[in-house]
Amino acid sequence: MGTIADDILGDLHGRILKTLDQLRTDLSAVRTGRASLHLLDNVRVDYYGTPTPLNQVATMSVPEARLIVVKPWEKSMIPPIEKAIREANLGLNPMSDKDLVRVPIPALTEERRKEIVKQVKHKGEEHKIAVRNVRREAKELIEVAEKDGDISGDDAEKALEKMQKETDDGVKKIDEIVAAKEKDVLQV
């Protein structure tokens, strides 16, 4: 196959991997009923007037399955940290305790678990669409290259077959990631 087709396939592969990474990142912030530091990834604390990521003003740990402990580097940050976690709409109720903030993770109700599973499936569908859009763009590039005479018809056909396999593999991987997250959410 020609280098143009190889370049297009390489780009397709890279973009599919980025989509899979983005899905993993998106799903890591979804509550499962167990404590995870990723739950607080998007929490911004007012640090002397500047919205600052929580992990830049405190040390965080998960000492128990349903508890996150946030230990600020400055004691004066305890009230703003509590406020930021409360206002992040994560359904969490932080409590200050001397020089740290305890964030108990409430158990999820069956109804809430089903709601979260729907969100997880929706995220999976969004990322499948992204993979298919990447394939469509790559297919158009292959067709233009063939039309312009940059690659032969046989090479274009081989590239399209590889492209379809790459896309199918990406979609299958998305299904696996979503299924694993669903299992995690439904596990009591």
Curated annotation (Swiss-Prot):
This is Ribosome-recycling factor. Coiled coil: none annotated. Keywords: Cytoplasm, Protein biosynthesis. Belongs to the RRF family. It is found in: Cytoplasm. The gene is frr. SUPFAM superfamilies: Ribosome recycling factor, RRF. The lineage of its organism: Bacteria, Pseudomonadati, Myxococcota, Myxococcia, Myxococcales. One of its GO terms (molecular function) is ribosomal large subunit binding. Responsible for the release of ribosomes from messenger RNA at the termination of protein biosynthesis. May increase the efficiency of translation by recycling ribosomes from one round of translation to another.
